[in-house]
Amino acid sequence: MYQVIKRDGHVAEFSLNRISSAIMKAFDATHIPYAPDVIDLLSLQVTADYADKIRDGRIDVETIQDSVEAVLQRAGYAEVAKAYILYRKNREKLRNMSSTILDYKKLVDDYLRVSDWRVKENSTVTYSVGGLILSNSGAITANYWLSEIYDEEIGNAHRNADLHIHDLSMLTGYCAGWSLKQLIQEGLGGVTGKITSAPAKHLATLCNQMVNFLGIMQNEWAGAQAFSSFDTYLAPFVRMDKLSYNEVKHCVESFVYGVNTPSRWGTQAPFSNITLDWTVPADLAGQPCIVGGKPMSFTYGDCQPEMDMINKAFIEVMIEGDANGRGFQYPIPTYSITKDFDWSETENNRLLFEMTAKYGTPYFSNYINSDMEPSDVRSMCCRLRLDLRELRKKSGGFFGSGESTGSVGVVTINLPRIAYLAKDEADFFARLDHMMDIAARSLKIKRTTIGRLMEEGLYPYTKRYLGSFDNHFSTIGLVGMNEAGLNANWLRKDLTHEETQDFAVRVLKHMRERLSDYQEQYGDLYNLEATPAESTSYRLAKHDKAQYPNIITAHEGGTPYYTNSSHLPVGYTEDVFAALDVQDKLQTLYTSGTVFHTFLGEKLPDWRAAAALVRKIAENYELPYYTLSPTYSVCADHGYLAGEQFTCPICGRKTEVYSRITGYYRPVQNWNDGKSQEYQDRKTYQVSGAAQPHAAAPAKEVKETAPVSGNADRYTLFVTATCPNCRAVKPLLQKAGVPYEEKDAAQYAEEAKALGLRQAPTLVAWGEEPTLYVGAAQIKAFLREYAQ
């Protein structure tokens, strides 16, 4: 006899009497007479209706109840079916009432005794009274989301582990990127009843404001907070005060220590990210610098020497680590690797790649072969939403976000379960569509909810500096593509096999197409993410093993977990290029956070080896983000130790072993059971003997600036109401005497769409053929030629 999976995940033996009893109650409610034989016949028809849905000797109670409704309808008992539906709704209300009651004693005891896996759900939250407070409030908030905000189907999908709704413990959005330029122009404050700081005039003041800003915003968001163009925007402050290198380093040091102070809820440091340009970006080079909230007489393009000082100081602080030699967890820096990147043996290059080799700190954005542009981190608010089916790519790094963008929430789909339950590939996609529909609806509900709460004043600083969530994505991710291949009865192979790789490509393309549908349906931005899944990969596998004992997880016979997103099994190969060849065709299909981690057993021999590997990956692959991730250890007395050493070889004391868990470094002792098992299973890549990449990426076309149209009859400037670059180019056009007509792209959407506009500002020169100057940089290039 088979078993029934209840809504709370518990399993009970099947009983035909329970079906018969429910049907009789529905008949009694309608006062329609019935014979016992009729009830028996209907009950048997119900079991026949769901028979083909039984998997591994189990079926969920919702499927049985759906069959009861269907059988009653087909048998002509429409009124009885209505009564049964009402019976289900009443039962739902009772469940919802009971689900809002928390066992406070168990909640606190489980945390204090570390008997609940959720105590280590997030490795950044240490066992502490702050962690206890977060655990208690998080349980209440999660209950509120699942019982009071989301409908039963969404709540059940999460509780039953069909999918995972992230950050239920917070009544906030997920992650956000902020405009550092806005903070420099406007200062910190502007919220009623709170202290306001004027725009910073000195680097030390700005560093303090950034620390405070990130700490404030972290309390209004669940995940990462990001600044873009960190080095570019800070450089003018060095120039204005003619600061020495030691003075610059002292300011940067105070910033780094400040953002690593556990000032956030849960005794955590703010999850902070910064992108560094390394060289002045073209779209900023000609803009006047802002210091003290006012434009200066010099431009960002004049400040490359000061940028070099900022970068040198930041890297030296990160390399030195804290007083015990421990690497700094934050901020997570992302560096842009462009075609023009200078690979020569400069001092800053040596420092950058020494930091990479020793601590694995930076992320690298691949602008050589990927379809991204460095200016993307600043242009999101300028993008025109004319084609609702166009999927945009989130900028700003794996965890970070570009200026004024981010994500309202993330939902991860449990792919191995779908594959395990599916009869064939067609059934797999039907089930995937259903789960994605639930995920998309939950994200729409969350967006609406937090949008209303922001208007009501729950997130005062977000309201002040952001204003709306219009440029924030609704994010859908996935976990366990590797195990989906193993559980799919038409494959039975993991991602190391070409058949499963081809299947993964079909799945990712199908999910992208589905996201375009949701953008049309809901009018919001959606993106596809390779979810970090720090705890999700463990939670979903743990649930699946309890409900479906024969399902295949990443570690059979031990602690179960699923492989992150569409990554290869962690113990597959030591050949980094063999892994890259497979991942390159998969990671380029995501439109949100995705990264290739080059896990290394210990630090590389020198900085040149790190630089060579970073360059080789960027020049030969198209994947957007990657890291070098060496394992290292820290002894309280003897500091940094290369590689995994659980005891100090000098004094024999217990050490902290650091590795990258999902995207950031934490001691492996703090990891949850699933990720700890993954760490044990993981093979590290051998680089010293690595040959050339197995597959070289084709060269990309270089985007050319539009030629100046000298015989234009007229000009039209397309703008948006919220675009800062639009406001910047208008006075430049007027000063140059360009006779232009201004049009709001939203009001003239059809005309803008016909011209193929994707970004504001865009200047159209009308001649025999319209010539487009897209973005502030191209418009400024046009003006230089126009003046001649």
Question: Over which residues does each language-model region extend?
Answer:
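Charged, amphipathic alpha-helical regulatory modules used
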Residues: 1-106, 468
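Core structural elements
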Residues: 67-72, 278, 460-484
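Conserved catalytic cores of very large enzyme subunits
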Residues: 90-94, 100-470, 491, 497-650, ...
